[in-house]
Amino acid sequence: MDEYAKIEKIGEGTYGVVYKGVHKATGQIVAMKKIRLENEEEGVPSTAIREISLLKELQHPNIVCLLDVLMQDSRLYLIFEFLSMDLKKYLDSIPSGQYLEAMLVKSYLYQILQGIIFCHARRVLHRDLKPQNLLIDSKGVIKLADFGLARAFGIPVRVYTHEVVTLWYRAPEVLLGSVRYSTPVDVWSIGTIFAEIASKKPLFHGDSEIDQLFRISELWGTPNNEVWPEVESLQDYKNTFPKWKGGSLAANVKNIDKEGLDLLAKMLVYDPAKRISARKALLHPYFDDLDKSSLPANQIRN
């Protein structure tokens, strides 16, 4: 830890305090995440350290780079490249009645998908995507942060400050207790984030797991085996759920054109097996008029 100096506390993440810091030798500004774990007496599990070390290999222009993993007094510090603004703060800063330019919405979504494809190709899920862990710079680049941390540390029910971890972006299969979920959980989250980038308000803002599920059901109709084979056998599915018929996506999401709504609907399909993949989403006509040559990862390398 002697190589780095803390400058100031900049926030509290899911797993602990985040500081702005500096690498003393080079002057590089970094983000330092101090990880606090539920059962701290036992120290940091070696499995977590192994998982985290693998994340150093996730190098892509749309993924926040993990520069270093350090231990000090049995505390784990993750050192990341520093970006000063997250998507949530940015959306909150836009004056009432104003929205992001349609082309910037499109560019952000395309870049988020590029980042997720890179990780999914390496069998790394995010599991906890939300506007707070999408970081942006002043040049229109967006990067995914906190990749793989959910697998290394688990997703706690509460942030260590006792603030409840948000459920707004969580896929229905996770809410219903599926243990065999995969890459489609991230696509669902990205769909809900897409709607929020365009309209500046969360698409489904439940305050508990059941409320979250009901808000999704009000829009899409209550899921059953007909639309989603075997959903009724998931552990948290109840036959007593209210039977909603479902409404219209266009009525609930503002500032997205017809092509965008078509893509969004495909990202929010109930059945994970029928939900569009991130790779297929990139080929959707919604992106036809986006100038991809200027994007930082315009050549995706697998």
Swiss-Prot record:
InterPro entries noted in UniProt: CDK, Kinase-like_dom_sf, Prot_kinase_dom, Protein_kinase_ATP_BS, Ser/Thr_kinase_AS
Binding positions for ATP per the UniProt entry: I10, G11, E12, G13, T14, Y15, G16, V17, V18, K33
Protein kinase domain ranges (all copies): 4-287
Enzyme class: transferase
Intracellular or extracellular location(s): Nucleus; Cytoplasm, Cytoskeleton, Microtubule organizing center, Centrosome
Keyword annotations: ATP-binding, Cell cycle, Cell division, Cytoplasm, Cytoskeleton, Kinase, Mitosis, Nucleotide-binding, Nucleus, Phosphoprotein, Serine/threonine-protein kinase, Transferase
Post-translational note: Phosphorylation at Tyr-15 by wee1 and wee2 inhibits the protein kinase activity and acts negative regulator of entry into mitosis (G2 to M transition).
Name of the molecule in the record: Cyclin-dependent kinase 1
UniProt lineage: Eukaryota, Metazoa, Chordata, Craniata, Vertebrata
